[in-house]
A protein has these predicted regions:
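Acidic, small-residue rich beta-repeat scaffolds with periodic aromatic anchors
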Residues: 2-10, 28-30, 34-44, 131-132, ...
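Terminal domain-start segments
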Residues: 2-92, 208-222
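Short consensus segments that form the blades of beta-propeller domains
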Residues: 36, 62-63, 112-115, 173-176
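Acidic/hydrophobic-patterned starts of short beta strands in beta-sheet-rich repeat architectures
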Residues: 52-61, 100-112, 161-169
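Structural motif
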Residues: 66-71, 116-122, 175-185
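Short loop/turn segments that connect beta-strands within beta-propeller blades
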Residues: 76-77, 127, 188
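Mid-chain, structured segments of secreted extracytoplasmic proteins
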Residues: 80-111
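Long, charged/polar, surface-exposed segments that mediate recognition or autoinhibition
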Residues: 99, 107-137
Length: 222
């Protein structure tokens, strides 16, 4: 199966350092305080057309241990699953159903870790036999951030292409100006390949290039 499309990402000098700011530690609870409730291990579900055949599959995510989750589905009678990891300190969200390249087959945007103001996601795809992680140009699992609070402006969006397909853009910036690079990739069989890198300098945060809209990446009909 070929998974093709154009992916556009943006990387920003200094954003990683901004995200490294320590969160304020809450005051210690008194000795008489009730202990925190255990995190739920109940499964969460969504629906997606993983192979683009018009049939809808139920996708389930469930915490299975310390910093581990399993994401699973059944496609044409075959059970498939993957363990992409998770932040077991917070409740688990159901995967977001996306179609990053507009080919009709779903990618799953899965939460990996949650900070005070920033959530980090990875992406999964169905290769015709099992679920796998979308990887970057270095064959490492894709990581996408959203949020950033006062330290950064982070997110992603998709834009339709003339003639079909989609552009997938990830955005990262400080809250005043946007400086860094925009990198154009193709997506094939769950792997990103860099095609072009475009430098960007001193864009204001109100510039449309910084617009983010996760819903614009949703799979049509999901």
């Amino acid at each position: 199966m070929n998974h093709t499309g154009i992916i556009r990402t943006a990387t920003i000098t200094g954003v990683a350092a901004a995200l490294g700011l320590a969160a304020v530690v809450p005051a210690l609870a008194s000795p008489l305080s009730d202990p925190p409730a255990a995190r739920s291990t109940d499964p969460v579900t969504t629906v997606a057309d993983l192979d683009g055949d018009g049939e809808i599959e139920t996708v389930t995510a469930q915490l299975t241990g310390e910093n581990d989750q399993v994401v699973s589905a059944t496609v044409h009678g075959t059970f498939i699953s993957i363990h992409p990891g998770a932040d077991s300190a917070v409740p688990l969200d159901a995967p977001r159903v996306a179609d990053l390249d507009g080919d009709g087959r779903a990618e799953l945007i899965v939460t990996r870790s949650v900070g005070a103001n920033t959530t980090f996601f990875t992406a999964l795809h169905y290769d015709g036999r099992n679920l796998g992680q979308v990887v970057d140009n270095d064959s490492k699992p894709l990581s996408v951030a959203e949020g950033g609070g006062v330290a950064a402006h982070l997110g992603y969006r998709c834009t339709p292409l003339d003639g079909g397909g989609r552009i997938f853009e990830t955005v990262g910036a400080d809250p005043i100006t946007y400086s860094g690079t925009r990198t154009v990739h193709t997506l094939r069989d769950g792997a990103l390949t860099t095609r072009k890198t475009i430098p960007i300098t001193a864009r204001p945060v109100t510039d449309p290039v910084l617009g983010t809209d996760a819903a614009s990446c949703a799979q049509t009909g999901s």
